[in-house]
Amino acid sequence: MERLPDVQACHPAYPINLTRVGVTGVKKLVKVERSGERPIVLISNFEVFVDLPSSRKGANLSRNTEAIDEVLEEEISRPVYEIEELCGKIALRLLERHEYATRAEVKMKSEYIVKRQTPATRVNCQEVVDIFAEAMATSGPDPHVKKIVGAEVIGTTACPCAQEIVREQMRRDLLNLGLSEDAIEGFLKKVPVATHNQRGRGSISIEVRDRKCVPIDRIIRIIEESMSSKVYGLLKRPDEALVVSRAHMNPMFVEDCVREMAQRVVATFVELPDDAVVTLKQINEESIHRHNAFAERVAKMGELRAELAAIHEMQPCGASQM
């Protein structure tokens, strides 16, 4: 075969290192095996990058898609159980393919279908969850791989502040109607009190090193349980009543959601090392405000464990002054 010129290997006009060069929007089918269950087939979006030294005009971008295809073909005979593991293998293959690179990065996003039942009528349904994984590999005699896996889940929250304002107004109105204090307190404890709601988007990403793996289903469950209520694609009338009631009996600020995720992550992932980095994020899309509410915590597992271990020394804060 006639040897063609390698323009990418030429010297650039300005010899400057580039942090990331690669391709985005690469769609591939990924099959993930599950122990004792049918495998999951994901339509996944990949982004792959390498760093570029100042001596090269460009990167050989075709090698990026070749690296993805090679790893996916190899995994047909060797099942993949974790998406972050797959990204890690692709990142290492990129370093093999790009001999001039010292760092490779792979990002993968997919829509994952989870099976659920409606809360009251128990009808089987399917819900879509966004999942993602990343891997960063560095070259050397003993290549180092850092992996991230996570998910974003939609739920609903009910505002505690507005609810307390409405509760106080209801208390005054009921007193004016002649009800006793005891009857009013019993009523307000039993009946969901009106407030405004938000569509919440909670996300968790966990960074682990080398061969540690994190089950994605556990992450999804934690996010779902860290808001006022889950939401569903299908709701019959009894389900709708139950979801609304649950949400208003469990009001949460955006900050509450992140703190709830934090304590659930610590309780669930006892096997993770203290240096595993966790990013917890909540965005609540407001219904009566023009802005959205945001909260985030980035910490190592050891830091979260230490904070929760000291919680018994803390006294609950008093009631807010309205």
Swiss-Prot record:
Keywords, alphabetical: Hydrolase, Iron, Metal-binding
Reaction equation(s) it catalyzes: GTP + H2O = 7,8-dihydroneopterin 2',3'-cyclic phosphate + formate + diphosphate + H(+)
Entry EC number(s): 3.5.4.39
Top EC category: hydrolase
GO molecular function, one term: GTP cyclohydrolase I activity
This protein's record includes keyword Iron: yes
Pathway: Cofactor biosynthesis; 5,6,7,8-tetrahydromethanopterin biosynthesis
Cofactors demanded by this protein: Fe(2+)
InterPro entries: GTP_cyclohydrolase_FolE2/MptA (IPR003801), GTP_cyclohydrolase_MptA (IPR022840)
Function recorded in the entry: Converts GTP to 7,8-dihydro-D-neopterin 2',3'-cyclic phosphate, the first intermediate in the biosynthesis of coenzyme methanopterin.
Similarity field: Belongs to the GTP cyclohydrolase IV family.
UniProt subunit comment: Homodimer.
Protein name according to UniProt: GTP cyclohydrolase MptA
